[in-house]
């Protein structure tokens, strides 16, 4: 999929009805001529709109309509004529969505990277990538870190459909990998959900739990989230108040308002630790799946070496 998406309406509803009626009641050629009448006056605006969203003409553009017919072919021709490298999706977006959903049903060699909140798992994933390991960064694609503070500092979340599209492409790119590292997540990441079939596969994969001391993780959380203003931190805590509990919520918010961010985060970390252990043990065959690796720091490079050494044993 493209790094960004742009909707270019070829026809408005009235124009679409006119062209469609001509195609059904007269013939294809008549419909094409009518379509060209509507399309012709929009060509320049379409090109200019694409220019606003692309860095240069060397950027590849994927053009699609719902079924991959003349509409996408016409726009692809126009952009190709202007100098862009263009391709279309055979069968249109409808076929692409069917392909997307099929990717979640396939088998993959997943390895789950686990650890309590604040264990620097995302940084460890990126460090594994630097060592030519295959990874899928679910939080990166979801634009959300998963916790109460997960949306802080992140761009807006994608729609569920766009999340699935990008996830399917990433799965396809790594389908032949010896192993694919994925961070242990809840099925819901902010406002998007990991597709059910894929979620089921992830829950059956080996889980490598990086066990890091509480104080190390607390320091990591403070460094990454303590920089945000009090209002944002309070709003984030309010989102989990039903699960966190009324007394704990009130205490944590008071700590933040008093400037004692460390104590507030300590309460939250204890909450997430309990929640994580409970969720982890809902897996079937957890005793067979779980591999615990002890570490004394959140250093991604050091923990990568520990992890890779462990799986070679």
Residue ranges and their predicted role:
Residues 82-97, 137-142:
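A short glycine-rich beta-strand->turn/loop micro-motif centered on a GG-aromatic cluster
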Residues 200-207, 211-313:
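Conserved NTP phosphate-binding and transfer environment spanning the P-loop NTPase/kinase superfamily
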Residues 16-18, 25-59, 97-102:
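Helix-loop module immediately N-terminal to the HCX5R catalytic loop
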Residues 39-89:
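Catalytic cysteine-centered active loop of the rhodanese-like fold, especially the PTP/DSP P-loop
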Residues 6-8, 87, 111, 134-136, ...:
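Hydrophobic/aromatic beta-strand patches that form the interior of the parallel beta-sheet core
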Residues 70-71, 111-130:
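Glycine-rich phosphate-binding P-loop
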Residues 130-200:
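Conserved nucleotide-sensing/catalytic segment adjacent to the nucleotide-binding pocket
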Residues 2-3:
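Short, small-residue-biased leader/transition segments that mark boundaries at the very start
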